Structures are given as C-alpha cells and as structure tokens.
Amino acid sequence: MKTQRDGPSLGRWSLVLLLLGLTMPLAITAQVLSYQEAVLRAVDGLNQRSLDANLYRLLNLDPRPTLDGDPDTPKPVSFTVKETVCPRTIQRSPEECDFKKDGLVKRCVGTVILNQARDSFDISCDKDERKVARLGGFLQKAREKIARGFKKIGQKINDFLGKLAPRTEA
C-alpha cells in the first residue's frame, strides 16, 4: 500500500507552502497606506459621519511629521477640508467635486493608522478660526467707523443747539 509520503504530492505541498510563506510579507507590506491615503480615508469617514448637506474635500495637508515604521501605531495628522458643491447623498468621490465658492472650511486634527486592515482614525474638525478672525477684524473696523460717525453727528447737534441758545448781552 502506498502512503502520501511516498508520492510526489508531499513535495508539491512543501513547495506551495514555501512560496506562500515567502509572499506573505509582501502581502502585509502592500496593505500599508501612505500618509496621504490614510488622510483621504479619514476625510471619507468624516463625510460619512457629517450632518452637513455637502461633501468635504481635502484642501491642505500639513507637512507629514516624522513617522516610526510601525503601521499599527497611531500617526498624528492635521489638515484642512473645504465644502464642495456635491451633495452628500450622491455616491461620488469628493476628489471629483469642485470646491464651493465661499464654502465652509474646517481645520482637522487627530490620528490615523496606516495599516489598511485596521483602517482606523480619530479626527475632530472645527471651523477654520482664521476665517473667523478675519471676520472679527472686519467687524472691529466697522464698529470704529460707526463710532466715529456718531461722534461727528453728536458734535454737529451740539454745535446746532449752541447756535439756538438765547444769547444774553451784558
């Protein structure tokens, strides 16, 4: 009676297992995302969680910090997204959408994991304070201009009333 060890199938299986073992590290390496790819996935996740009417698209990605080699370690990220013209309800990539004129800009910070199998991110976004600061400066200038106008009006009223006052002659 012939056993499997005696036949050529054991040699074939050994060869298959050896080749499979050699290709596994390549498959694991292929699952690591680049820094920008991880951020784009985070933007997609933000769009899915968003209650806003339109999609957001990556506007600016801050320079990549020095990263360690472990794709499972959370990496710090900071970037800016801007509202697009595409409604959130359509199935379209934000990269295919134009930015909305005067669209909302959000500043986002957090962490991403580069291991594609884990696909994890922890990002929070706030309205871009730089736009708000510019608006605050505009409002401050407008307030000062209005105050100067009221002061001039007050002075003219005072001058007018001064002319109406009865003059007493001595």
Curated annotation (Swiss-Prot):
Proteolytically cleaved by proteinase PRTN3 into antibacterial peptide LL-37. Proteolytically cleaved by cathepsin CTSG and neutrophil elastase ELANE. Disulfide bonds join C86-C97, C108-C125. Coiled coil: none annotated. Residues 31-131 form a propeptide. Residues 1-30 form the signal peptide. It is found in: Secreted; Vesicle. InterPro entries: Cathelicidin-like, Cathelicidin_CS, Cathlecidin_C, Cystatin_sf. GO terms for biological process: antimicrobial humoral immune response mediated by antimicrobial peptide; defense response to Gram-negative bacterium; defense response to Gram-positive bacterium; innate immune response; neutrophil activation. Its main location: secreted. One of its GO terms (cellular component) is extracellular space. Keywords: Antibiotic, Antimicrobial, Cleavage on pair of basic residues, Disulfide bond, Immunity, Innate immunity, Secreted, Signal. Belongs to the cathelicidin family. Antimicrobial protein that is an integral component of the innate immune system. Binds to bacterial lipopolysaccharides (LPS). Acts via neutrophil N-formyl peptide receptors to enhance the release of CXCL2. Postsecretory processing generates multiple cathelicidin antimicrobial peptides with various lengths which act as a topical antimicrobial defense in sweat on skin. The unprocessed precursor form, cathelicidin antimicrobial peptide, inhibits the growth of Gram-negative E.coli and E.aerogenes with efficiencies comparable to that of the mature peptide LL-37 (in vitro). The cathelin-like domain (CLD), which is the propeptide part, does not seem to exhibit auto-inhibitory function, as it does not inhibit the antibacterial activity of antibacterial peptide LL-37. This is Cathelicidin antimicrobial peptide. The lineage of its organism: Eukaryota, Metazoa, Chordata, Craniata, Vertebrata.
